[in-house]
Amino acid sequence: MDRVVGGKFKLGRKLGSGSFGEIFLGVNVQTGEEVAVKLEPLRARHPQLHYESKLYMLLQGGTGIPHLKWFGVEGEFNCMVIDLLGPSMEEFFNYCSRSFSLKTVLMLADQMINRVEYMHVKGFLHRDIKPDNFLMGLGRKANQVYIIDYGLAKKYRDLQTHKHIPYRENKNLTGTARYASVNTHLGIEQSRRDDLESLGYLLMYFLRGSLPWQGLRAGTKKQKYDKISEKKRLTPVEVLCKNFPPEFTSYFLYVRSLRFEDKPDYSYLKRLFRDLFIREGYQFDYVFDWTILRYPQFGSSSSSNSKPRPTLRPAMNIPVPSADKAEKPPIGQDSRERFSGVFEAYTRRNGSGTGVQADQSSRPRTSENVLASKDTQNQERPNSLSRNLSSSRKAIAGSSVRATSSADFTENRLSRLIPNNDRSSTTLRTQFAPSSSSVATKAAPTRAARDITLQSLELLSIGNSKRK
């Protein structure tokens, strides 16, 4: 007999696992909606699922914020039921041969800045900005960027008094070393400026294909972090952003000039990239690089590329810079399984003929609002008390895989909850989610995974008539 959690969510096959517990595909038996179900043992050494669910509730209502369906205790487990989302930026990056065009980066940057700003308005720092923590939506939200993984989020000010947390030093590094700010490496308490600096590194990673401090070798994690910190501090932003528009240098110079408690001028940062977008003659048509790879005819009409796209080749042949931890070897069949579930959902939801939408409910008509979103309005909207939150399989996996979490999630305990489920997969990686700690990176997908990607994207609705 299949197990049901929350009274209506039937558990299916396992999607992934980690020190936090395991993630399963689920379905709402009343509506047929597919969901992701995250299970955490009640006796976990560092339980965090309850904390994460509270973050979802506090952030609910914002554009690009996933929605939680249900949270509660079922048997020996904390359970969180979340909507499925599409692939992560890291997965799309691999799909695009680890290189994004300037147009794609600028379209993503505008939404990503909005997401970070929204979290800050709500009083929280994300503290783990990286490609794996930004996902695309499904169906009518297929071109909307979602920010996920609130396991390391921290409240930086009191929402009533607006009192900022105090400046501190000698802090351990929290987040992912590759994208951490210089001040974070130096042990300084993080604030809003650090999320934005991390986002800048993310954008340059997309443009360059890698960052100068990737692939450094060291004997211990501390030595590795020290080497990354030194290389990052000794790399001038002008060198980091060389051969790319000066707006990226301006971005770094601004965010690094902010003091600990300063409120960033998010509008200035978005305006930098919006003006560049217009000057390059791009159209905000939601035609991303991954769209062009599947539908080349859209490339000629969208002015999508500031440079020739690399030839699509098997991802296993793409050199992937070493992670901030030891890289995992390619996993063959596991990679096929890792991709299949998400693309099944991606195909079904995006091939329904409903079209896709991003932040705007209608196509922009003026240059001023060509990249604008509804985030500003959502930031002023009061929180609803309903527990209607959502995330992806990756959200649940990535948000909880922290180095400090080491719950013993045994197969015997799991079998009592889901006696008939296939538990053959023991990999710590899940669909479109890093399941190692925040400082890990994923191996490039296999040729089989790429084939699944191509097949599933065939039904993606991208016609202009479908965009509203």
UniProtKB/Swiss-Prot annotation:
Record EC number: 2.7.11.1
Segments for region (Disordered): 299-335, 349-447
Keyword tags: ATP-binding, Cell junction, Cytoplasm, Kinase, Nucleotide-binding, Serine/threonine-protein kinase, Transferase
Localisation: Cytoplasm; Cell junction, Plasmodesma
Binding-site positions, ATP: L15, G16, S17, G18, S19, F20, G21, E22, I23, K38
Catalytic residue positions: D128
Reaction equation(s) it catalyzes: L-seryl-[protein] + ATP = O-phospho-L-seryl-[protein] + ADP + H(+); L-threonyl-[protein] + ATP = O-phospho-L-threonyl-[protein] + ADP + H(+)
Database matches in PROSITE patterns: PROTEIN_KINASE_ATP (PS00107), PROTEIN_KINASE_DOM (PS50011), PROTEIN_KINASE_ST (PS00108)
PTM description: Autophosphorylated.
Biased composition regions of type Low complexity, renumbered to the chain: 383-393
Pfam families: Pkinase (PF00069)
Molecular functions per Gene Ontology: ATP binding; protein serine kinase activity; protein serine/threonine kinase activity
Superkingdom as given in the UniProt entry: Eukaryota
GO cellular component: cytoplasm; plasmodesma
Gene3D superfamilies in the record: Transferase(Phosphotransferase) domain 1
Protein kinase domain sequence ranges: 9-278
Ranges of compositional bias, category Polar residues: 349-382, 421-440
Bias kind Basic and acidic residues: ranges: 324-335
Annotated InterPro entries: CK1_Ser-Thr_kinase (IPR050235), Kinase-like_dom_sf (IPR011009), Prot_kinase_dom (IPR000719), Protein_kinase_ATP_BS (IPR017441), Ser/Thr_kinase_AS (IPR008271)
Function (record text): Casein kinases are operationally defined by their preferential utilization of acidic proteins such as caseins as substrates. It can phosphorylate a large number of proteins.
Subunit structure: Monomer.
Similarity annotation: Belongs to the protein kinase superfamily. CK1 Ser/Thr protein kinase family. Casein kinase I subfamily.
Protein name: Casein kinase 1-like protein 13
Organism of origin: Arabidopsis thaliana
Organism lineage: Eukaryota, Viridiplantae, Streptophyta, Embryophyta, Tracheophyta
Gene that this sequence comes from: CKL13
